[in-house]
C-alpha cells in the first residue's frame, strides 16, 4: 500500500487529543455510554471534535489546528464545558487518568465502528484490555524529512514525557507499583514501542510499504508507535502520555512538546543514529516504573543520571523556544512540578494511603475534572 504524501503544515502548530473516561456513578465504574454523550454534544461544538475511541467507555476530545497553547486551551475548555453539561444530564461522570483503577476489561464493549471491529478481529482480547487513556500531541512540520528528524529527536525525551504525565498506578483493583502502568498494556502488540529505524522520509515510505504486506496495516492509524509521523496532517504525533487529571496539565505537556520540537528543529542538537535506540526500552521502563525517580543510562558512555535532573536540563534547554511560542507558562509549571518531586500517580497513592478507596479516588477525579 502506498503512503500518502506528507502534507505541508505550518511548523510548530499544535493539535491535542485527550482520551477521557466515561464514569457511571455512584459505583464509579466505567460506563458503556460514550455514544450517548457523543450524540448529545456534537451539535454544540464550534471548534474541535468529540468522537469515539476503542471502547464505549472512552471519549476522545481533539482540538483543531492551533497556533499556540492558548488557542488549544480555549478549544479544549469549550469542549470540556459541553461534555460536562451533557454528562450531568445523563447522570454520568468524566475524568482523566491513564487507567481506571478497578474496571474489568472483560466488560468493555468495542465501539460499533468498522475500523475498531477489524482491530478486534486482528487482536482479540488485547483490544478490550486497551481500555486505557492517553494524551496525544501533534506538532506541525514543513516536510517529511523534518518529521523524521523531529521524531528521532523527540525519542530522546520519551522517558521525560512519561514521567511528567504518569497517572496510572492502579489497574484491575491493585497497585501495580508503576507510575505509568498504561503503556504496559501495549507490550503484546507487534508495533509497540519505537518506530523501526529509518533516516529520511523516502526510507519511511519503504518501511510503511513493507509493513502493509502484513495485511494488518491499512493506514498510519494502525501503527501504535510511541511517536509516529502523520502525513495526512503534516505532523509528528507523540503518544506516550497518560491523560492528565486536569486540563491545565494537558496544556503544559503540549507546551513542552511544542517547545522541544522548536528547539530540536532550529538548533539540531542531535545527529540521529540507530544506536540512539539501544537502551530506549530500558530508559522507557525506568520512567514507567519509577516516574521522575527513574534513572537514565546513556547508550554511548554508560553514564547514569536521575530522570528528574535530566528533565530540569531539558526544561532549561527549551525555555528560549517556549518564550518564542508563548509556552513559557507551561515550562514554568513543569519546572515547579519537578522541583516538588511529584506527579499525579504519586498524588493517587497518597489519597489511598490517607484512607481513601479506589471508588473514592475515581469520584475525586471526576470532581477535579469538573473543577469542583
From Swiss-Prot:
Q: Which organism is it from?
A: Salmonella typhimurium (strain LT2 / SGSC1412 / ATCC 700720)
Q: What is this protein called?
A: Putative glutamate--cysteine ligase 2
Q: Which UniProt keywords apply?
A: ATP-binding, Ligase, Nucleotide-binding
Family the UniProt entry places it in: Belongs to the glutamate--cysteine ligase type 2 family. YbdK subfamily.
Q: Name one GO biological process term.
A: modified amino acid biosynthetic process
Q: Name one GO molecular function term.
A: ATP binding
Q: Quaternary form?
A: Homodimer.
PANTHER family from the UniProt entry? GLUTAMATE--CYSTEINE LIGASE 2-RELATED
The entry's function note states: ATP-dependent carboxylate-amine ligase which exhibits weak glutamate--cysteine ligase activity.
Organism ancestry:
Bacteria, Pseudomonadati, Pseudomonadota, Gammaproteobacteria, Enterobacterales
